[in-house]
Amino acid sequence: MNVDAEASMAVISLLFLAVMYVVHHPLMVSDRMDLDTLARSRQLEKRMSEEMRLLEMEFEERKRAAEQRQKAENFWTGDTSSDQLVLGKKDMGWPFQADGQEGPLGWMLGNLWNTGLFCLFLVFELLRQNMQHEPAFDSSSEEEEEEVRVVPVTSYNWLTDFPSQEALDSFYKHYVQNAIRDLPCTCEFVESFVDDLIEACRVLSRQEAHPQLEDCLGIGAAFEKWGTLHETQKFDILVPIVPPQGTMFVLEMRDPALGRRCGCVLVESECVCKREKLLGDVLCLVHHHRDPSAVLGKCSSSIKAALCTGFHLDVCKTVQWFRNMMGNAWALVAHKYDFKLSLPPSTTSCKLRLDYRSGRFLSIHLVLGVQREDTLVYLVSQAPDQEQLTSVDWPESFVACEHLFLKLVGRFAPENTCHLKCLQIILSLRQHQSLPHGASRPILTSYHFKTALMHLLLRLPLTDWAHNMLSQRLQDILWFLGRGLQQRSLHHFLIGNNFLPLTIPIPKTFRNAEPVNLFQHLVLNPKAHSQAVEEFQNLLTQVKTLPHAPLAAAP
């Protein structure tokens, strides 16, 4: 009877845990597991292990208590022939047994109240699971006079008719691959051409106390190899600048809590002896001068007069100086090339337009940057479209860090991965997407989709991005961004990301900082959130109809 009682209680415990597992982890029709399901399953495994451990401890405690009672009764009755507890005897009582009943059946009949509560708990859990499977975008606002009606988008209903692997491959080859066939060679030419201009600028500014130009760095979609047809004619180049001898740049960062990540570049005088070690007993003529500040002032007076507002480097003045340098440099190297170069006006970047005789043209945007310490974080001259900054504010840019991250992924990932193809397919569809009625510009940008991709590249093994997983990974990116829209939350990839590889050189304060929400403006502006949801829904419609209809140009 002892063995039967223990076996019965073990069976009941296992049945209880099995029911709990089915309730908390229902099997879906699809064989794919999203990130939330994976996290819930791991939490459930831990909870089940903890519950099993508690049940075993409770059983052992009850068993010891029963043994103590048996010994005490044997002592008072004089029966000391055996000190072992025989479970299941009516006079001794089974720990999980009601009076007058024997075995597990008696326990069930004697604890109808607990059984009823357990059934109510099961019903509640089933209802809760059904409610959780129907998330919807809430884009209504009490402040708006006219309520905006948005069709809910769940995380399951639109995945059922998602395009197949073959349909996505066909679309990619027809609309993306053919358009970017010559993109790698064009990127290589653009970088070499800009380097040629920069070398000519160095020759022209050798005798001037102006900022020095470093080697350029190709950034953006074209150079990160996720460019589409729209990016094949537009190229972004970062040109770092450093102070001339006798001058130093001091970066004064503004408080990020104010909502803007930017800083000012303070121009100060600096003696060369602080940078270079003087040999032997050579004396510094500046610091041994009666008035060192007067000598140092002459070294930085020209740059302050030409490029500064007050004591800070002015974005517009610096870009205009750089634009003039590019024009003079072109005069030195024009004989090498067979196209016409023009410089369209711009206040935050130096734009170059290359017109060929065939009618083809290339647009190059040269963005100036001041490096922050020994990292790949720069203060750049070009601000995002939605930000309004003063002429001495230089926005903070992580584009070089992101460029390095994607480069490392391409180096260590298996051959022919699909992570860039996913982004190219999404952006190719968005380029042919009409804006919602009354909208002047889109809310969702290519940077939002790129951020979602980079987050998933850290969460999923690189082997999960094989070519035959294109359809699944494309669904993951759309699901990730859709959930972010629903929650009005999309964290910046680099700021506050503890999972970022240490090979990405960013300041330690950024790793330990609070995450930055790229969708914060959607929290403050319900109308913008409604537009973003509509844009996302239109994109889903385009993806689902991908195999059946050709692309049409947006008006």
From Swiss-Prot:
Q: Which UniProt keywords apply?
A: Cell membrane, Coiled coil, Membrane, Signal, Transmembrane, Transmembrane helix
Q: Which Pfam families match?
A: Mab-21_C
Per the record, what ranges lie on the membrane's Cytoplasmic side?
125-555
Gene Ontology annotations for the cellular component aspect, listed alphabetically: membrane; plasma membrane
A GO molecular function for this record?
Answer: receptor ligand activity
Membrane-spanning residues: 104-124
Q: What is its main location?
A: membrane
Q: Report the subcellular localization.
A: Cell membrane
Residues making up the signal peptide according to the UniProt record: 1-24
Mode of membrane association: Single-pass type I membrane protein
Q: Which residues lie on this side of the membrane: Extracellular?
A: 25-103
Q: Let me know which tissues express this protein, per UniProt.
A: Expressed in testis and tumoral cells.
Coiled coil (residue ranges): 38-74
InterPro entries found in the cross-reference section: ITPRIP-like, Mab-21_HhH/H2TH-like, MAB21L/cGLR
What protein name applies here?
Inositol 1,4,5-trisphosphate receptor-interacting protein-like 1
Give the source species. Answer: Homo sapiens
Query: Lineage of this protein's species?
Result: Eukaryota, Metazoa, Chordata, Craniata, Vertebrata
